[in-house]
Amino acid sequence: MADKKSSPKKENPQDKTYAIVEASGKQFWLQPNRYYDFDRCQAEVDDVLTLENVLLLNDGKDLKLGKPYVKDAKVEIKVLEHRRGPKIIVYKMRPKKKTRRKNGHRQELTRVLVQSISIGSNTKKSKAVKTTASKVESD
């Protein structure tokens, strides 16, 4: 039987880079070149947004923890598409009575791609983007 020698995978510091950011009222663990689904934000497709509420940043060498945010840390994301999440069915029934109610809901989402995670004052200051879903009222 032949021995299979496993070659060690060469680790790139880019692979270990991640940031924990606050967006849409939640905290997200973001890595470069991956896409994530946020609550619907008011941005057009192909817009590049900058998130500055970085709680923690690891660039592969050292870990920076914010109090509450890391100073001069930015995450640039690109809006890929606006979509809707899976349908959630809520069914309420009272036993021995003729009371039944069935509701469905699909959450409005924005799919974004993380382009870069950076720290330092060499990046230009941009306006903060509010990434919260707006409440839709029906008549």
UniProtKB/Swiss-Prot annotation:
Keywords on record: Ribonucleoprotein, Ribosomal protein, RNA-binding, rRNA-binding
One GO CC annotation: cytoplasm
Keyword NADP: no
GO molecular function: rRNA binding; structural constituent of ribosome
PROSITE patterns linked to this entry: RIBOSOMAL_L21
Ranges annotated as spanning the membrane: none
Signal sequence range: none
GO biological process: translation
InterPro entries in the record: bL21-like, bL21-like_sf, Ribosomal_bL21, Ribosomal_bL21_CS
Disulfide bonds: none
PANTHER family on file: 50S RIBOSOMAL PROTEIN L21, LARGE RIBOSOMAL SUBUNIT PROTEIN BL21M
Quaternary structure and partners: Part of the 50S ribosomal subunit. Contacts protein L20.
Family the UniProt entry places it in: Belongs to the bacterial ribosomal protein bL21 family.
Function per UniProt: This protein binds to 23S rRNA in the presence of protein L20.
Protein name: Large ribosomal subunit protein bL21
Species annotation: Prochlorococcus marinus (strain NATL1A)
Phylogenetic lineage: Bacteria, Bacillati, Cyanobacteriota, Cyanophyceae, Synechococcales
